[in-house]
Amino acid sequence: VDNKGTMTVTDPESIGIQVDGDQAVVNNEGESAITNGGTGTQINGDDATANNNGKTTVDGKDSTGTEIAGNNGKVIQDGDLDVSGGGHGIDITGDSATVDNKGTMTVTDPESIGIQIDGDQAIVNNEGESTITNGGTGTQINGNDATANNSGKTTVDGKDSTGTKIAGNFGFVNLYRSLTLPGGAHGVANSGD
């Protein structure tokens, strides 16, 4: 699926693009605005790839920019990602998932998560600049054998704000650039063996 236009999705159960099946590829070139419980792109199947080159804005509880349910899912986020109000920018459920985040990521408000992966052997590469504020979470991985590589500048500010959180055994976070933590925030939270 090649989406080159602007996508606006609002309200629960509304989905901009839905693909059911293995080895799906979705290319989002234009801007996406997802609000009030909607989902921009949803892929159900193994070996899926989503390429997001345009800016993605996600606002509101249960709103999700890109969602993949299946093993070996991959999201390449070249465009900016702005998440607020309890939304999720990227949400993958399945083992061996990979996210390459090359754009600027801004996450604000409690329960807001820029990137969430539920599954083992996940890899997240944050290469762009990240700003996490007001109780938001930049990257959250729930599963064993996870790796987060943070090579971009990260600023985390505000109570309960977290840059990278891993819940599972044998998780690794590699920091290659500056991490700024004013205001009672957490840069890295790793729970597990």
Residue ranges and their predicted role:
Residues 15-22, 39-46, 61-70, 88-95, ...:
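Glycine-rich beta-solenoid repeat tracts in large extracellular/virion proteins
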Residues 1-13, 25-37, 49-62, 74-86, ...:
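Beta-strand-rich solenoid/repeat architectures in extracellular/passenger domains
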